[in-house]
Amino acid sequence: MEAYYSVLAKKGFFPLQEVKDQFSKFGSPYIGHPNNKLPGIEMNSGSLGHGLPVCVGMALAGKRDGRDYRVYTVMGDGELAEGSIWEAAMAAHQYHLDNLCAVIDRNHLQISGNTEDVMGHENLHDRFASFGWHVIDVSDGNDIDALQKAFIEAKNTKNQPTVIIANTLKGKGSPVMENKASWHHHVPSKEEYATIMADLKKREEAI
């Protein structure tokens, strides 16, 4: 959420310093999930399985109103255990929503541990393809260039919705966080923060 709020702040919806000072504090509007009381945010989310169904509705409304906007949603792989995701996937195919693109953050981790131990998600490509979706596999979902190519392909896909399966590494960039489920909602200590920022600085300098 910090990244989402930061992007909106950079776009002028609210002051960036306000986000830095108030994020996730008691009584703050900058809570841990999107808050539609803030400008630039149309819907609250957080409860698993809500994002894709709402986006299907937005995409369908756009089609019926003759508007040319596109709808994007990001889902965690753990979220795919929710039945509402698959109901929405069927509806997106039924209405040929080629203005809809879903991105799955496939890092094999959720708040309660490994996704495969909770609810297996093998053959995601074939599952979505069987629901009538155009499926794009990105082997390195942390590669921005690869993701950009996938978004271009999605935009050029006609008559069916697109899902991008982005195989990612949770917490990539710092060994302190990488591939650890405990960082799903962990707030770093001052020492951890300093180490993480130093790791990210090294990566930035290496680019």
Regions found by a protein language model. Give the residues of each.
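Glycine/aspartate-rich loop-and-adjacent alpha/beta segment that forms the canonical ThDP
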Residues: 144, 148-207
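Short acidic, glycine/serine/threonine-rich loops at helix termini
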Residues: 5-6, 84-86, 112-116, 174-179
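Generic beta-sheet signal
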Residues: 69-73, 100, 160-166
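A short alpha/beta connector and helix-capping loop motif
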Residues: 82-107, 163-165
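Short beta-strand segments
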Residues: 59, 74-75, 103-105, 165-167
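Short, solvent-exposed amphipathic alpha-helical segments in soluble enzyme
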Residues: 10, 87-92, 118-119, 152-154, ...
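Conserved thiamine diphosphate
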Residues: 66-69, 116-150, 201-207
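Cofactor-binding active-site loop characterized by glycine-rich and histidine/acidic residues
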Residues: 1-94
